[in-house]
Amino acid sequence: QECIRLEIQIENEVLVPRTDMVDIFKKCVASGKKVSLITDMYLPACVLEDILDKNGIVGYQELFVSCDAKQLKLQGLFELYKEKVQDEKYLHIGDHKIHDGICAGLAGIDYILISSGVGLFRKTGFAECTDYAQTLEERVMLGLVIAKLFNSPFVETTDEGRMALQEEYDYGYGICAPLISKFAVWLYETIKKEAVDNILFAARDG
């Protein structure tokens, strides 16, 4: 039970809502559209409802979770959704070609595929960073960069794998901050290992 509690706590701390998609969700709800959420997830609906609420994702009609339904999207979760909702037309939005695309289509549901943050990341020159992220600390840092720079599924990338950073802050967060953070960690570990008492920082004015 303690492990489960800790896992849920960590999920709450690290999950990042995709702002543009949350905005679209809210506009759909505000316009009176019937919106349901469907997910393949090992956590039960009661836990997910709390996480969604904390991220301002409210107003949906139903939450269909494979963990509770004992059915994945591949195994009939979409059919269960249609049976419960009973409408003439359905549109599903997701980021997985098979689970959100093919499975929805086979269930007679129209679908729109968006790119996941990781999917967008892999299309850019940043993708090479995964070869160098070996430690947990480095992978966490990379995850933070992906969550920030590729939060929107509408980020523009070129065929050459280039992307346009929208603000100066993004340059600092995605490029400078990881370098400085890595240096700070290295410096701390070196000081501890060498039992250094004093550190002198040289600075140049101007």
Predicted region positions:
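Acidic, divalent-metal-coordinating active-site segment for phosphoryl/phosphodiester hydrolysis
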Residues: D95-Y111
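Short, acidic loop-to-helix structural element flanking the phosphoryl-transfer center
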Residues: E2-S36
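A short, well-structured juxtamembrane/interface segment
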Residues: P17-I24, L179-K193
